[in-house]
A protein has these predicted regions:
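Acidic, Mg2+-coordinating active-site environments of NTP-dependent enzymes
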Residues: 47, 71-219, 242, 294-304
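Short, ordered loop/turn segments at secondary-structure junctions
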Residues: 15-16, 58, 79, 133, ...
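Conserved helix/coil segment N-terminal to the catalytic DExD/H
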Residues: 59-67
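Structural beta-sheet core signal
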Residues: 12, 54, 74, 111, ...
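Conserved nucleotide-sensing/catalytic segment adjacent to the nucleotide-binding pocket
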Residues: 24-57
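ATP-dependent carboxylate-amine ligase
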Residues: 159, 179-206, 210-320
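Switch II (G3) loop of P-loop NTPases
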Residues: 49-59, 218-225
Length: 320
């Protein structure tokens, strides 16, 4: 959205798909395999694209999918528990992510200094800048105000102050927009144009997306699939909740099972009522997955119900 406001042709590669020059390719992997990726890059160049915003997964780094690519800027948001079914430990997961910032692969790292791993990456990156809300950094925000409709804050962007308005709520969106603004400023985009671009973004599909109202209740859909992601979403909504906060979720099958009870605990702590249901069980029994989540919920509350069929669960939750 910032590139668009600046009149710059930009491509986008990530979990939501591949987008450029009015083209859209449905996602298969967060980071495509190298052969397909380079084919997309070539077509982007032919289509007049000059910049690419790309999500690079830890799996892609582990398998060397982006070994031949040199990045102008690499943003580090945070390191939280995920993919331990593959990496085994947080140390190995962090080591995979760290590959993006080491050596000549990344010309400049843009690091979240409120995250311990983000601060540590400053020692391995050849050049880095920082953003934060709680620790000293190059870019930070003050006077943050949030509601269901979005948030606004004053950004200090390398000592240049400007009001930023977002159509998305949540402190995590403040962090993400600061990182985007910092990159855009380094590229040379004027701060008023950066603010215009951020304000023009109506929503990000499935990212704390406001789905509408039902019987006076505001309904949000979020991609949260980790304990940290679920907690951030519930914390973002809680201050603006006029009544009860109901959380409906499940966990994917054949993926990190350790996070299932942890996510149950998060929902029990931060929501008033939890609806446990199925979410892409793959080759596992959906009920077995839900029972693993339930172990975490039961530690803190009895305010929950299991409705394995997702459609029925959604109907129950909105009526609740």
């Amino acid at each position: 959205s910032v590139f668009k406001a600046a009149g710059i042709s930009c491509g986008n590669i990530g979990t939501l798909g591949i987008f450029y020059a009015n083209k859209e390719i449905a996602p298969e992997l967060t980071t495509p395999d190298p052969v397909f990726l380079y084919k997309v890059f070539a077509d982007m160049v032919s289509s007049g694209v000059s910049w690419v915003v790309m999500e690079v997964s830890a799996h892609a780094l582990y398998y060397g999918k982006v070994d031949g690519i040199r990045f102008e800027y690499c943003i580090f948001t945070n390191l939280t528990e995920d993919h331990l079914d593959f990496f085994g430990t947080m140390e190995k997961y962090g080591a995979a992510k760290r590959k993006l910032f080491e050596g000549e692969r990344c010309k400049c790292a843009v690091l979240n200094f409120d995250d311990e791993e983000g601060r540590a990456l400053a020692a391995v990156a050849q050049k880095s800048v920082s953003y934060a809300l709680e620790n000293p950094s190059d870019v930070f925000a003050v006077d943050i105000a949030e509601d269901f409709g979005g948030c606004r804050y004053i950004i200090n962007l390398f000592d240049e102050l400007y009001e930023i308005r977002l159509n998305m709520t949540g402190r995590h969106n403040v962090y993400n927009s600061m990182a985007a603004a910092e990159c855009a400023k380094l590229i040379g985009i004027p701060v008023p144009v950066i603010a215009e671009g951020l304000a023009s973004l109506e929503k990000v599909s499935g990212r704390l997306e406001r789905a509408g109202k039902y019987r006076g209740a505001d309904i949000f859909v979020d991609f949260a699939h980790t304990p940290d992601g679920l907690e951030k979403s519930l914390r973002a909504l809680r201050p603006h909740c006029r009544g009860r906060l109901v959380c409906l979720f499940g966990c994917g099958g054949n993926r990190d099972a350790l996070k299932r009870p942890l996510m149950g605990e998060i929902s029990a702590k931060f929501a008033d009522f939890t609806v446990l249901t199925s979410d892409n069980p793959r080759y596992e029994d959906p009920f077995d997955i839900v029972l693993q989540i339930e172990k975490g919920v039961k530690k803190h509350t009895n305010e929950y119900i299991i409705v394995v069929d997702r459609e029925s669960a959604i109907e129950y939750a909105v009526d609740k």
